[in-house]
């Protein structure tokens, strides 16, 4: 359901973005280390641009879970959440529950294992260490690790929206473009966050 922001308007213009009456809200587990919460929220909100292309604004929102309401539970199936799990599993996953009659996605509880940061560290130091001095450290700066967390959380949110891996997207980019600094800055190195083309390891130091 959508509502038009123009007072008294019977119909919304095709070019006007409308707000859903019930936006998708994904809460961040209060147990999540505070310094990573803004990056997880941004990973959710990064999908707003995709919904804007479909005509909706503020259709998906990441926010901190309430901590002052004793009746609110992170495990309540009426709420979607990114759940922090203090585990040595180096992974994250984005399952969802859907209504088999309509296909409507009802809720998600994204699994965010603490040790996914070790996985991110290993990926980045191997794939980007040649061109990013920030990768050649025993521990990444919070800003770098935060951006890596943002990227993975956005990927997992994509799964909760029903998207599968898009391994073909990176194949559309010619190798020479991956070494073209201006082109990559303008277009990125892969068209889809759902690909596994995580970092541009084709690029070389200038």
Task: Describe the residue ranges of each PLM region.
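Zn2+-dependent metallopeptidase catalytic core
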Residues: 30-59
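Short pre-active-site segment immediately N-terminal to the catalytic Zn-binding motif
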Residues: 32-36, 135-153
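Active-site recognition of the HExxH zinc-binding catalytic motif
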Residues: 42-48, 103, 147, 151-166
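Acidic helix-start/capping segments at beta-turn-to-alpha-helix junctions
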Residues: 59-82, 173-177
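Acidic, His- and aromatic-enriched active-site or binding-groove loops in soluble protein domains
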Residues: 76-102, 106, 184-197
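Conserved catalytic/binding loops enriched for acidic/polar residues
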Residues: 169-206
